[in-house]
UniProtKB/Swiss-Prot annotation:
This is Chemotaxis protein methyltransferase. SUPFAM superfamilies: Chemotaxis receptor methyltransferase CheR, N-terminal domain (SSF47757), S-adenosyl-L-methionine-dependent methyltransferases (SSF53335). It comes from Salmonella typhimurium (strain LT2 / SGSC1412 / ATCC 700720). Methylation of the membrane-bound methyl-accepting chemotaxis proteins (MCP) to form gamma-glutamyl methyl ester residues in MCP. Keywords: Chemotaxis, Methyltransferase, S-adenosyl-L-methionine, Transferase. The gene is cheR. GO terms for biological process: chemotaxis; methylation. It is an enzyme of class 2 (transferase).
Length: 288
């Protein structure tokens, strides 16, 4: 039986139903490229994840071969597809008030400081972390203009768009108190029931921007009283981790805090930081 579809449509259908081959050589090239561009180290067991995420890019571009896709990337170092490639391979697991023990430490530190208290969320993902920081500072310091500011960044431009929107499912805010939910969020009605949006009064204190932590210099409005860089260093090798931590040093004020993820340990990487608490590091006053 012959197909009644035009040949072009038949080709597209075949792409959608057939599993494309990802050779060892192509997987190694992908690992090299994402390491060069974003510093991310992909282990062999991530191969299925890489396939499932990048095959969507191939199909969106009408390509049926990973080699052609990689050659297209390498042929134009300024192609917009590079950002799509990075977005596809970054992992964004986050939640409001994740690793909750950090936030009372942040609040206490903020109350003891003078002037505008500034925080950088260096892996902001879809916004849950920077908004959790903002809620903590609003509760601790109030909402007077110029009292505090949160700068939030990520390499993934797609998650930053969601973060800027400030829209979340109500079910994602279970870690907030009823008072915080009422004070800092608006509930959706009608077709938007079950959704909430960050109130503009809080959102005004949070600034979002795209930053690649591999850059030699960060275009960020430091220095900061605290930096949150949680659950992102685990994707980098030790050399890259050390380089990033050294770039953080001049961006922190004396006795500034660095918050790390639960599985990250920076104690033996950079001598300027000393352990202050559970996954919390302080910049030595004489090293700033």
């Amino acid at each position: 039986m012959t197909s009644s579809l035009p040949s072009g449509q038949t080709s597209v259908l075949l792409q959608m139903t057939q599993r494309l081959a990802l050779s060892d050589a192509h997987f190694r090239r992908i690992c090299q490229l994402i390491y060069q561009r974003a510093g991310i180290v992909l282990a062999d067991h991530k191969r299925d994840m890489v396939y499932n995420r990048l095959v969507r890019r191939l199909r969106a571009l009408g390509l049926d071969d990973f080699g052609r896709y990689l050659s297209m990337l390498e042929a134009n170092q300024n192609s917009a597809e590079w950002q799509a490639f990075i977005n596809a391979l970054t992992t964004n697991l986050t939640a409001f008030f994740r690793e909750a023990h950090h936030f009372p430490i942040l609040a206490e530190h903020a109350r003891r400081r003078h002037g505008e208290y500034r925080v950088w969320s260096a892996a902001a993902s879809t916004g849950e972390e920077p908004y959790s920081i903002a809620i903590t500072l609003a509760d601790a310091l109030g909402m007077a203009p110029g009292r505090w500011k949160v700068f939030a960044s990520d390499i993934d431009t797609e998650v930053l768009e969601k973060a800027r929107s400030g829209i979340y499912r109500l079910s994602e805010l279970k870690t907030l108190s009823p008072q915080q939910l009422q004070r800092y969020f608006m509930r959706g009605t009608g077709p938007h029931e079950g959704l909430v949006r960050v109130r503009q009064e809080l959102a005004n204190y949070v600034e979002f921007s795209s930053v690649n932590l591999l850059e030699k210099q960060y275009n960020v409005p430091g220095p900061f009283d605290a930096i949150f860089c949680r659950n992102v260093m685990i994707y980098f090798d030790k050399t890259t981790q050390e380089d990033i931590l050294r770039r953080f040093v001049p961006l922190l004020k004396p006795d500034g805090l660095l918050f790390a993820g639960h599985s990250e340990n920076f104690s033996n990487l950079v001598r300027e930081f000393s352990l202050r608490g559970q996954t919390v590091y302080a910049l030595s006053k004489d090293k700033a």
